[in-house]
């Protein structure tokens, strides 16, 4: 086992990364090794997808499968070895299918096929022990390269994982693009070559950022086409009397299905974690039994799910061990999510979840409501732009802070709470992702009617924040980096990595990230990123605020 992809990975003087019997996320060594082998097989699929495309051979099922299966290897997504092995076998089938089509096309045109070694030819064993014996071939830190090359490879790999997740979220909402799929395969195949060219790897990281910008636009289109544009909305964060289902993750299509199937059954539906922004979409407001948001960010789920008196559905990341809170008999996984022994819902029938919710006691009484405001995504931000601009021009608003990203359980993450509390009263705070839970229940007031806290949405809604920044740049006729805007991002996993790459690829500079630097990036790489982009780690609130406000 070697895994260094998330913020909570083990860090020691001898080296970074989880490399024992179990990772910090709870992932067993066997699961980690199978995930590496799955990635290895997917690189083989992509290598032949690239070659097949030279002859006009495109398979939409394969274009869908590769990012979806890749998504299963993100932090806190799939811990089920058997399902991961099934993905690997399917990858082998698809690879060989493309290989055969490519060879036939070459033969038809009288050219010699260029075969792919390694990922292009490995045949998986037929049992789990034998498959695990094959896993060392796919070990991510194999090959004896220096820490800079390894770090750049992993930056690209983990960034592409984040992009794959957003591709799958977009696909669920009927948003696909053959050119995006082609670019994805090209990068995936390149990463399978284990390049030692630092310049090429760095350029690839920027290409991944640009690719993800297109993918986030697709996802934005899918969400707004399906559910309308989010509107500023008051949301209750307390319990409501009655039977209950909690929907966590990111998949709004699943939420819609659950709402449709629970209508009239006396079941209240709550969002959790990154599903909170769903409550701002017009399409969901017709469901009176979508009553609010319960709980906070992913890392608190073992306590929150244990006390939630209903059924829980994990539509995507992040899942952590449900046996700790003894609720594994009433939590259900969807799509690429998996945990051994937890019921996985196939298809679109949620009747088992509904029946479980009806069996359980539900909430006995209504708590006193506590309301928060959400829904400041792209359209709402653009609608507010003239008022915001006027307040900037008259000096009422002097600075913007984007404080968001992933949450986690390290005490150092209180930095983001303290920062939000400490920004000047003439500042606006934009937030997104589950990092918002560090401060989204606080009252920040308003500036001449403009709320000082604007919840933009899920982590992928960084796209909306980017659109606002680009609009303000044009209005004020200045460079993007000359806006009175500071970005402070909390990161935890691979979606945050690809959002960061997207911002860097767009030329955004002087971003601060925390609470720690990615363990896969060497000190030298961090220095290079600081020199080129002004990217730096968070320190303490007072010092960082002074620097961001250009106060000596």
From Swiss-Prot:
Cofactor remark: Binds 1 [2Fe-2S] cluster. Binds 1 hybrid [4Fe-2O-2S] cluster.
In which broad location class does this protein mainly occur, judging by the first location in its UniProt entry?
A: cytoplasm
What GO terms fall under cellular component here? Answer: cytoplasm
Q: Record keywords: Aminoacyl-tRNA synthetase included?
A: no
Tell me which residues bind [2Fe-2S] cluster.
Answer: 3, 6, 18, 25
| Key words, A-Z | 2Fe-2S, Cytoplasm, Iron, Iron-sulfur, Metal-binding, Oxidoreductase
- What EC number(s) does the entry state? 1.7.99.1
What's the catalysed reaction? A + NH4(+) + H2O = hydroxylamine + AH2 + H(+)
Q: Quote the record's binding site residues for hybrid [4Fe-2O-2S] cluster.
A: 250, 274, 318, 406, 434, 459, 493, 495
GO BP of this protein = response to hydrogen peroxide
Name the Pfam families for this protein. Prismane
What GO molecular-function term can you cite, just one? 2 iron, 2 sulfur cluster binding
Is RNA-binding given among the entry's keywords?
Answer: no
HAMAP family with a match to the protein in the record: Hydroxylam_reduct (MF_00069)
Q: What does this protein do?
A: Catalyzes the reduction of hydroxylamine to form NH(3) and H(2)O.
Q: What is this protein called?
A: Hydroxylamine reductase
Q: What is the species of this protein?
A: Shewanella frigidimarina (strain NCIMB 400)
- From which lineage does this chain's organism come? Bacteria, Pseudomonadati, Pseudomonadota, Gammaproteobacteria, Alteromonadales
């Amino acid at each position: 086992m070697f895994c260094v992809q998330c913020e909570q990975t083990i860090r020691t003087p001898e080296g970074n990364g989880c490399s024992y019997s179990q990772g910090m996320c709870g992932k067993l060594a066997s699961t980690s090794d199978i995930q590496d082998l799955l990635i290895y097989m997917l690189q083989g699929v992509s290598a032949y997808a690239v070659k097949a495309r030279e002859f006009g051979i495109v398979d939409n099922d394969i274009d869908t499968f590769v990012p979806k299966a890749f998504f299963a290897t993100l932090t806190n997504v799939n811990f089920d070895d058997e399902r991961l092995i099934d993905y690997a076998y399917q990858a082998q089938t698809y690879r060989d299918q493309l290989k055969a089509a490519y060879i036939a096309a070459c033969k038809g045109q009288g050219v010699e096929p260029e075969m792919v070694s390694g990922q292009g030819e490995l045949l998986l064993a037929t049992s789990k022990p034998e498959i695990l014996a094959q896993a060392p071939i796919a070990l991510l830190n194999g090959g004896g390269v220096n820490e800079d090359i390894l770090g750049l490879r992993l930056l690209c790999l983990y960034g592409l994982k984040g992009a794959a997740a957003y591709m799958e979220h977009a696909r669920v909402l009927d948003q696909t693009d053959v050119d995006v799929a082609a670019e994805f395969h090209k990068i995936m195949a390149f990463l399978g070559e284990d390049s030692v060219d630092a310049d090429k790897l760095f350029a690839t990281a920027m290409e991944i950022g640009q690719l993800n910008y297109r993918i986030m636009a697709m996802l934005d289109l899918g969400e707004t086409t399906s559910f309308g544009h989010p509107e500023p909305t008051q949301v209750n964060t307390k319990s409501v009397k009655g039977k209950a289902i909690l929907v966590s993750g990111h998949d709004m299509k699943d939420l819609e299905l659950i709402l449709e199937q629970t209508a009239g059954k006396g079941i209240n539906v709550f969002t959790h974690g990154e599903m909170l922004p769903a409550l701002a979409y017009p399409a969901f407001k017709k469901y009176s039994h979508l009553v609010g948001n319960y709980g906070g960010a992913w890392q608190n789920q073992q306590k929150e799910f244990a006390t939630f008196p209903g059924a829980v559905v994990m539509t995507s990341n992040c899942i952590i061990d449900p046996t700790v809170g003894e609720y594994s008999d009433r939590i259900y996984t969807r799509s690429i999510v998996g945990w051994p022994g937890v019921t996985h819902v196939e298809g679109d029938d949620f009747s088992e979840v509904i029946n479980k919710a009806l069996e359980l006691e539900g909430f006995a009484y209504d708590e006193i409501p506590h309301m928060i405001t959400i829904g400041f995504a792209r359209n709402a931000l653009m609608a507010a732009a003239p008022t915001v601009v006027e307040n900037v021009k008259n000096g009422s608003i002097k600075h913007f802070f984007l404080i968001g990203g992933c949450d986690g359980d390290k005490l150092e993450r209180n930095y983001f709470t303290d920062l939000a509390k400490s920004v000047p009263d003439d500042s606006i705070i934009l937030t997104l992702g589950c990092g918002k839970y560090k401060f989204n229940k606080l009252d920040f007031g308003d500036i001449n009617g403009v709320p000082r806290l604007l919840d933009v949405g899920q982590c992928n809604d960084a796209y909306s924040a980017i659109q606002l920044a680009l609009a303000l740049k044009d209005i004020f006729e200045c460079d993007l980096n000359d806006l009175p805007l500071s970005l402070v991002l909390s990161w935890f996993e691979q979606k945050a990595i690809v959002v960061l790459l997207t911002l860097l690829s767009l030329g955004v500079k002087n971003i601060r990230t925390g609470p720690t630097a990615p363990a896969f990036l060497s000190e030298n790489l961090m220095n290079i990123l600081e020199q080129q982009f002004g990217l730096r780690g968070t320190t303490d609130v007072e010092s960082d605020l002074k620097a961001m406000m250009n106060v000596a």
